[in-house]
């Protein structure tokens, strides 16, 4: 989580979560690199004063993270799949909120009307499968949600607590958890 101040002194909250695939050798490192790259990308955007909370920002962030993961894989002479991880993010200011997601896990938010889960956790073709930011089709699988309201409460989580945090019948927040 990072809190920054925009040029007009308005607060900006950035929350990013990534979860390395358990079936690959560098999943944890991939997750760490993804979150660090997302934070660096946001810092650059805030300093440059060019911040639009929209699909373009989400897509460009994902492309930047992918470049970093591909570079790390090449440097270590590994396949990029070895760095597979999910990626979730929320960026919120008084002017709006952007949520993005590739993979399972979730971002629960209160935009002033109670808790909601704007994006459904992704599932793969088979049980216990999901999608990763390193997948060939990651950019096309990227899901986003935008709102003109600021986030009053935020919780981002991986699949490790997904079944505790959500009512799995309707993919809604399990309010007592929060």
Across the structure, where does each feature detected by a protein language model lie?
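PP2C/PPM-type serine/threonine phosphatase catalytic domain
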Residues: 1-178
């Amino acid at each position: 989580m990072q809190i920054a101040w925009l040029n007009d002194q308005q607060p900006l909250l950035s929350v990013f979560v990534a979860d390395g695939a358990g079936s690959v050798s560098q999943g944890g490192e991939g997750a760490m690199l993804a979150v660090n790259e997302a934070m660096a990308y946001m810092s650059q955007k805030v300093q440059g004063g060019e911040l639009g909370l929209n699909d373009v920002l989400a897509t460009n962030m994902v492309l930047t993270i992918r470049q970093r993961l591909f570079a790390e894989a090449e440097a270590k002479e590994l396949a990029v799949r070895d760095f597979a991880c999910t990626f979730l993010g929320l960026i919120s200011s008084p002017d709006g909120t952007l949520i993005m997601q590739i993979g399972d896990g979730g971002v629960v938010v209160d935009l002033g009307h109670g808790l909601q889960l704007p994006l459904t956790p992704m599932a793969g073709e088979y049980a216990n499968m999901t999608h990763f930011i390193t997948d060939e089709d990651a950019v096309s699988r990227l899901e986003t949600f935008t709102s003109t309201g600021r986030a009053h409460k935020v919780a981002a989580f991986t699949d490790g607590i997904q079944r505790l945090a959500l009512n799995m019948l309707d993919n809604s927040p399990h309010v007592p958890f929060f």
